[in-house]
Amino acid sequence: SLFPLSLLFFLAAAYPGVGSALGRRTKRAQSPKGSPLAPSGTSVPFWVRMSPEFVAVQPGKSVQLNCSNSCPQPQNSSLRTPLRQGKTLRGPGWVSYQLLDVRAWSSLAHCLVTCAGKTRWATSRITAYKPPHSVILEPPVLKGRKYTLRCHVTQVFPVGYLVVTLRHGSRVIYSESLERFTGLDLANVTLTYEFAAGPRDFWQPVICHARLNLDGLVVRNSSAPITLMLAWSSAPTALASVSIAALVGILLTVGAAYLCKCLAMKSQA
């Protein structure tokens, strides 16, 4: 009937708060489930970034890292790293950190930013390494039936992540990992290997390869190729000379005895 409807309009006109309350209830009833309004104390979403995320330097050098964030009013910003820290510069939305005397081959730096009670972080990896200054393969030296191969890798760091490989033609004849070395200074490495060469091994190049494996970063350097030449050793040559001289002496003795025998037979005739 029209009476309840007219009464509703009358109440809304006489008491404006009733109409607004009814409107709020209607909107609340129509709102989808699982999407309540966020309380006023919820943390503000923000991001944290480090630049650069990966940096490689020579041992003993310094590094500058920049930590930026999108927090309107950060409560705190700090850097956690085992490396020694230097000067820190700050600006709106960023902090610049200086790391001194980097010597560990791989280190992490974490930048932590707290915003509205929530902490986020970003990470940079710092690698200290020195690629081999040179890789030198000495000319092979023949001793008996084996060639002595000697390879020099100079001024390399870290030695513990160095792999030295000798390649003859298309095949690897020797490879050694130097992971037992844990020094924190530049070093020179010499690898010596004896190679028994067969007839098919001559006239093929020998190359020494140096490789640093740094958790995904691979640094390579190689020597100039040296061809394995056929050579005579002094000991076999001397032995052959003695054998030939002995054979000649035997032949001369036999020949002289035969000649004397022939002459004796002729004189008797």
Swiss-Prot record:
Coiled coil, from the record: none
Keyword set includes Mitochondrion: no
Cellular component GO terms held in the UniProt record: plasma membrane
Record topological domains on the Cytoplasmic side: 260-269
Location of the protein in the cell: Cell membrane
Chief localization: membrane
Glycosylation sites: N66, N76, N188, N221
UniProt entry keywords in alphabetical sequence: Cell adhesion, Cell membrane, Disulfide bond, Glycoprotein, Immunoglobulin domain, Membrane, Repeat, Signal, Transmembrane, Transmembrane helix
GO MF annotation terms: integrin binding
Membrane-crossing segments per the record: 239-259
Domain of life assignment: Eukaryota
Alphabetized InterPro entries for the sequence: ICAM_N (IPR013768), ICAM_VCAM (IPR047012), ICAM_VCAM_N (IPR003987), Ig-like_dom_sf (IPR036179), Ig-like_fold (IPR013783)
Extracellular side: 21-238
Post-translational modification: N- and O-glycosylated.
Signal peptide, first to last residue: 1-20
GO biological process: cell adhesion; cell-cell adhesion
Domain Ig-like C2-type: 60-122, 144-215
Residue pairs linked by disulfide bridges in the UniProt entry: C67-C111, C67-C115, C71-C115, C151-C208
Membrane-topology annotation of the record: Single-pass type I membrane protein
Gene3D superfamilies in UniProt: Immunoglobulins (2.60.40.10)
Function: ICAM proteins are ligands for the leukocyte adhesion protein LFA-1 (integrin alpha-L/beta-2). ICAM4 is also a ligand for alpha-4/beta-1 and alpha-V integrins.
UniProt similarity note: Belongs to the immunoglobulin superfamily. ICAM family.
Annotated protein name in UniProt: Intercellular adhesion molecule 4
Organism annotation: Pan troglodytes
Species classification: Eukaryota, Metazoa, Chordata, Craniata, Vertebrata
